[in-house]
């Protein structure tokens, strides 16, 4: 199935808004909104940890993972992955999210405050996006190849 990012974005944002769930666009999708041009992998959206159960009835048939605690080499968080019209969407719990700082070799809190955002228009909808500085800051901590590409693109924009 061909990926329909716009349709998936409008679908999940509509559900979050209908349930009055605070949210924030982050990750590679946010980086693209700020000017990175790398290929989009998924749509990352931060939500409060207790919001998963609120939206569950509306999204349950699209869940491919979770909601559950997830930890890998970079992330430690509550995570649920959805697939809608070929587009992967990661819903990330923001209350306890941590990232692994590759410089200090320590787990540290990631940007958690969903009220500190930049409003951006995406597909005709105004949505809260992680501030560019916070996005760059966490990408400088986890330093995956995609993060380095985003950092280079975002820091070199005039």
Locations of the language-model features?
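Compositionally biased terminal segments of proteins
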Residues: 1-158
